[in-house]
C-alpha cells in the first residue's frame, strides 16, 4: 500500500470503528491482531495489503466508496495541520493566550495521526508560560506517541520535542540535562523528513549549553562541524547564532583576530536581514573583543550600539551579559562609579530571570569590583554566592573561578581559609579534568 494512501485509509478505518463503538480487540480475530489494526490506523508503512483489505471487509466498507471517504479524511487532516501551523505561529509571535484557546478547541485523541504534533505544541506553549512540569509531561507524551507514527516521523516531531525538553532544562539551569536531551533529539532526527532545520537548532542549542558550562573546546567542535553546512540552514537567526557562537568561543580561546572577523561578518549579515536580536549579541561580543585588546574606545563604541538596541527586546536576560561586560570595561578603566550601576543592574536582571550562568558572571564581576579596590571582605560574599550557585548547578568552570577568587581574598586575611580554598580548587580541577572539556576558565 502506498505510504500516502495508508494514512488516509487508516483514518477511515479508525473513524468507522469508533463510530460503531468498537475497540481494537472487538475488530481483531485469529487472522489479525489488535496491534496490526492499530498499525494500519496509525498509517504505519509496509503494512500488508491483504491485512488492510481484510479489515475493510470486516467493517463492510465498500472499495467503491473508499476513494471518496479517503478524500474526506485527507481534507480533515489538512484542516487540522493548518490549525496546528497557526497555533505554532501564534506561540512564536508570543500570542500565547490565543494559541492556548486554539489548542483547547482541538483536543486530538492519542491515536490521531497529528496527536504527537499536538502535544509537542502544547509543551512549547507551556514552556513560554514557564510551566515546566506540565510542559515536560506534554513533551514526554509527544515522544511516546511518536512511536510507529509515520506522520510524526516525517515531521521530525520527536526530535523537536527533545529540543523543547532541552530548552525547559536550560531555563531551569540544568545544563547537563539540556545537553543530554539535545543528544537524544539528534539521535531521533530523520534526515529524510520535513523540518530539517531542527537538526541545526539542536546543534546550535547544544553549543550554547556547553558554552554556558564553560566547555569551550567541545562547543567549538560543534561549530566547526556545522560551519560547512551553513548554506543548508533556512533559518537566518540560527545561522547568525553560529556566527555569534564561533566568535564568542574563539574570543574565549584568545584567538581575537579570528573572533573579530566572524563577529564583523555576522553583524553585516544580521544588518542586511534586519535581525536585531543577533545584532545585539554580535555587537556585544565585538565590544568584548576590543575590551580584551584593551582598545576601550572602540569597546565603548560597540557597547553604545548595544545599549541603543535594548528597547527592541522583551528578553531581559540578554542584558545581563552586556551590562556585566560594560561594568568590567569601566573597572579596567578604573572608572568605578561608572562600573557599579551596570553591575548592579546585571545582578538584578540575573536574579529576576533566574539565569544562573549569567548571574554567576555578574556576581563574580561585582566581587572583582570590591576586591580590586582593596575591599576583600566585601568581595567575599559575592564569591561565596557564586560558589554555592555553581556547585548546585554543576557549573564546574565557574565553581573553580569562585574558589580561586575566594583564595585571593583570604590570602592576606586568614591562612587556614586560604588553604581550604586552594584544596577546593584542586578538587574541582580534578572534576574538570574528568569532563575532558572544561579548558577555558574565563567566564565573561
Q: Residue locations for each model-derived region?
A:
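TPR-repeat structural position
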Residues: 96, 132, 175, 216, ...
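Tandem amphipathic alpha-helical repeat scaffolds
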Residues: 80-93, 116-132, 159-173, 198-214, ...
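Short alpha-helical DNA-recognition segment
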Residues: 20-39, 342
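A short, Lys/Arg-rich alpha-helix, primarily the initiator
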Residues: 1-19
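Eukaryotic all-alpha helical interaction scaffolds
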Residues: 103, 146, 189-190, 223, ...
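DNA major-groove recognition helix of helix-turn-helix/homeodomain DNA-binding modules
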Residues: 48-66
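Flexible helix-coil transition and linker loops at the boundaries of alpha-helical arrays
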Residues: 72-73, 106-114, 145-157, 188-197, ...
